[in-house]
Amino acid sequence: MTHQFPPLTTEQKKELHEIALRIVSPGKGILAADESIGSMGKRLNQIGVENNEENRRLFRQVLFTADDRIDNCIGGVIFFHETLYQNSDDGVPFVKMIKDKGITIGIKVDKGVVPLPGTNGETATQGLDGLSERCAQYKKDGADFAKWRCVMKISETTPSNLCITENAKVLARYASICQQHGIVPIVEPEILPDGDHNLKRCQFVTERVLAAVYKAMFDHHVYLEGTLLKPNMVTPGHGCPTKYSAEEVAMATVTALRRTVPPAVTGVTFLSGGQSEEEASINLSAINNCRLVKPWALTFSFGRALQASALKTWRGQRENEAAATEEFIKRAEINSLASQGKYTVCGDSSGATGLSHYLSSYAY
């Protein structure tokens, strides 16, 4: 007979479940603003802005100063370590700004990917060392949930069984550690869109990966009601010549989830995976309109697909801040509708909303 040591108390479980429910309340999703310094550098470079701490702070401020229209759209914001301790121009901590809106604070806790020996260029995610101590500190500093990202690619030889198993175990250990400190773990096993594979192949690999993840979660005694899943939508590879409808993407995605994700999981918060803002919203709405039974909240945890138009509008200029914030609010409202299956094509995807955000081997 196996047991969890130390076991979570009834009070701990209640807190974790309530946090998870709050994040994915109807119509709400997650703003992923946890890009690393290097990833922010790539974004800022695209608009000709220097990558320094002040410019990173200014852009995060554009997002965080959104008015109360986002209160019913955003249930959680994922911070990067640097951002957790930054303030607005007025000296108000970003954490306080977000919490005052009734939005839950999250924190990225992984330390990035490293090569996995014995594989054909595959990776595992590091950061378990010292994670318990970091979680304890982040909880004191206002964070109630965390995110950990593992990455896999589809090719003729990948993902290998070794890669899938190793990353599943790492995700489960991370989740267990978080829960001991009252932090809801977001489990993110991302399958990259790199390659020319079709929809069926992506669905098969997604099912393999998610099945392994939840086997590991069970083995590590993770309390599923106090977790969220952040998977890729099931989409064809970026180089696939076949184009699929949003309804086909939705059916493949929901089918994969139904075959692998226990109903006890509180919510599924999809990553955008390099899709354009508009494409991600359309697919999310289609997923929520899929006629199959869906026992979880199905919503968004978008980074680029919430920020691209705002970033393009801002361009590092003070006079553009208000307009950039409006662009962010617009995307938040659209994705709120999409998470309820109520969004239809807006008709204009010629600007930033229609631009693909695909980057080969994308890393945060």
UniProtKB/Swiss-Prot annotation:
Name of the protein: Fructose-bisphosphate aldolase C-A
SUPFAM superfamilies in alphabetical order: Aldolase
Enzyme Commission no: 4.1.2.13
Signal sequence annotation: none
Annotated site (Necessary for preference for fructose 1,6-bisphosphate over fructose 1-phosphate): Y364
Organism the protein comes from: Danio rerio (Zebrafish)
Oligomer status and interactors: Homotetramer.
GO molecular function terms attached to this record: fructose-bisphosphate aldolase activity
GO biological process: fructose 1,6-bisphosphate metabolic process; glycolytic process
Keywords recorded for this protein, A-Z: Glycolysis, Lyase, Schiff base
Pathway field: Carbohydrate degradation; glycolysis; D-glyceraldehyde 3-phosphate and glycerone phosphate from D-glucose: step 4/4
Record-linked Pfam families: Glycolytic
Tissues of expression: Expressed specifically in Purkinje cells in the brain.
UniProt family annotation: Belongs to the class I fructose-bisphosphate aldolase family.
Catalytic site positions: E188, K230
Induction comment from the UniProt entry of this chain: By phenylethyl alcohol (PEA) in the olfactory sensory epithelium.
Catalyzed reactions per annotation: beta-D-fructose 1,6-bisphosphate = D-glyceraldehyde 3-phosphate + dihydroxyacetone phosphate
Coiled coil: none
Sites where the protein binds substrate: R56, K147
GO cellular component: cytosol
